[in-house]
Amino acid sequence: VPANAVTESDPAAVALKYHRDAASSERVAAARPGLPPEEQHCENCQFMNPDSAAADWKGCQLFPGKLINLSGWCASWTLRAG
């Protein structure tokens, strides 16, 4: 886990219901439109920055200066175009 990874106790993460592992998130109860809940994760979200950081950790527009796990999910998940 990178030192600058978003923690689930981070105030912004709590507000957005971010979980590092989408399977342990509220994505089924709070599913967003675009894909079935089980297919919603940070890797296919429009807020994820695909050009940043390591393989499993990327930047996110919602958590400036921090990294999210591609297997994560938050309540702002929005399907990336394309």
Swiss-Prot record:
[4Fe-4S] cluster binds at residues 42, 45, 60, 74. Disulfide bonds: none annotated. InterPro entries: High_potential_FeS_prot (IPR000170), HIPIP_sf (IPR036369). It is found in: Periplasm. Its main location: periplasm. GO terms for molecular function: 4 iron, 4 sulfur cluster binding; electron transfer activity; metal ion binding. Homodimer. Belongs to the high-potential iron-sulfur protein (HiPIP) family. Specific class of high-redox-potential 4Fe-4S ferredoxins. Functions in anaerobic electron transport in most purple and in some other photosynthetic bacteria and in at least one genus (Paracoccus) of halophilic, denitrifying bacteria. This is High-potential iron-sulfur protein. It comes from Marichromatium purpuratum. The lineage of its organism: Bacteria, Pseudomonadati, Pseudomonadota, Gammaproteobacteria, Chromatiales.
